[in-house]
Amino acid sequence: MENLNLEMTLGAGLEIALVIVGLLIGIVGFVSFVISCWLAVKYTKFNHIENSVHMTGEEVARKVLDDHGLEKIKVKVTGSLMFGNSYSHYFKKVRLRRMTRHKTSLTALGMGVQKACLAVLDKEKDPDMKKQIRLYPMITFGPFAFIPLILVGTALEYFVFNQSGTCVYVLGGLGLLFYVYAIVLSVLTLRTEKKAQERAYIYLQEKHMATASELEDLRELFRLYNIQYINDIILASLELLYNVLQIAIALNKGSSKK
């Protein structure tokens, strides 16, 4: 009887914790939405401001690459949804959005330099960049790389609440591994992006390609990107905790029935 009461108390505590974490996920998710909207506003605003050197995103990226002996790295246009502004180690190319590549805007200047600086970090064998490349070859596919994570998370939620025994352990463990994997990669991505941003500021200053005002605007833009990365890490961590609690509740219910 005492064991039963203990299991019931533990189960109630886990249920309360699950609700609290669920609410936190909702709050952080809302904050993430607000940040994304604000980032889109700033990105668009700066994309309508002419940069002082009148260079397109492609021209700027090409210059950075050539100045660092990376002539073999290509600069390609990409759609906004699949790849976005990014650098691919495996395909040896810097990808810029259509709205960025051919524009002589402040956004184009910042994105062109910063993404090219990722290639420079790769060439210099930056430790965080090396870890990111080793752990995540799918980084090439941008947001679509997280589709398996979403699918596994959905499957986890279904099976944990509808199955028992082996399914809970196998799918639960698999789902948790995906979340841990995503968190580690998000941290590495944040580190490499920040390093590339700092390299971009230094390059623009040394080459006299941006005014003090432009550099401040770019810092504001990249700061929002970094906040978004941090927010995503927090969200993924909460989702990991949420799924741990789901598994714990399922296992507690299973033991109560025995």
PLM features per residue range, with description:
Residues 17-26, 147-151, 239, 246:
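Alpha-helical transmembrane anchor segments and their immediate juxtamembrane flanks
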Residues 121-127, 149-160:
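Membrane-helix exit/interface motif
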